[in-house]
Amino acid sequence: MARILIKNGTVVSPTGRHETDVLIEGETILALFERGKADALNVTADKVIDAKGKYVVPGGIDVHTHMELPFGGTSASDTFETGTTAAAWGGVTTIVDMALQRYGENVHEGLAEWHRKAGGNCAVDYAFHQIIGGIDEQSLKDMTYLVEHEGVTSFKLFMAYPGVFYSDDGQILRAMQTASENGATIMMHAENGIAIDVLVQQRIARGDTDPKYHS
């Protein structure tokens, strides 16, 4: 695998800024050297990048994206191709998108559809959170299957959007119990959808439909 040595830059890490050179082999950061140590040790590389005056940072991970998401008769404007290309230009090297499953739909088919959308179309690495619309016996089984066989480690549940994604407290509890057994993480869209729908209807009845009332 090709080796790349990034020299003379300022490395930004969780511990601060460091005058450090970075040796990369393939897609792995192989070593960090204090300034000048790489030369002293006669470290060789296929390509040397002079990053003088620049910051060197790890690739960002965007853990909440919505590529090609259909919702409410509209769709997210970014495709996996355009969205991940923009991400790469901004220094993001991994996204975690939301694979979609609504009431009455099969969880496996929802994940497979998102793989079809993303496969071969991404400029960066990608993974998926799995949205589950309405918890039932089958989706509880599917959660564990996806953890054990499909590499899914997190599930998105909703307290909003009745009839589309909504799960009640009992359903959410059962999903959390299942996640405690299979090691997954539960993420919550924690808005009270039932109350919101009442408020929306009241606003509409009063004619309060300007964007400012959305807040």
Predicted regions and their residues:
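Metal-associated gating/positioning segment near the N- to mid-region
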Residues: A51-N121, Q138
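Distinct, well-ordered alpha-helical segments
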Residues: V107-L111, E137-V147, I196-R203
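Histidine-rich, glycine-flanked metal-binding segment
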Residues: A2-L5, T10-P58
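Active-site-adjacent beta->alpha loops and helix N-cap segments on the catalytic face
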Residues: E105-A112, V164-A175
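Short amphipathic alpha-helices and their capping/turn segments at secondary-structure boundaries
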Residues: L41-K52, T84, D142-Y145, I172-H189
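Active-site gating loops and adjacent loop-to-helix segments of metal-dependent hydrolytic enzymes
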Residues: G90-V92, R116-D125, G193-S215
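Divalent metal-dependent hydrolysis catalytic cores, especially in the metallo-beta-lactamase
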Residues: T82-E105, G119-G134, H149-V164, G183-M187, ...
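Extended substrate/RNA-proximal surfaces in nucleic-acid metabolism proteins
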Residues: S139-L157, M176
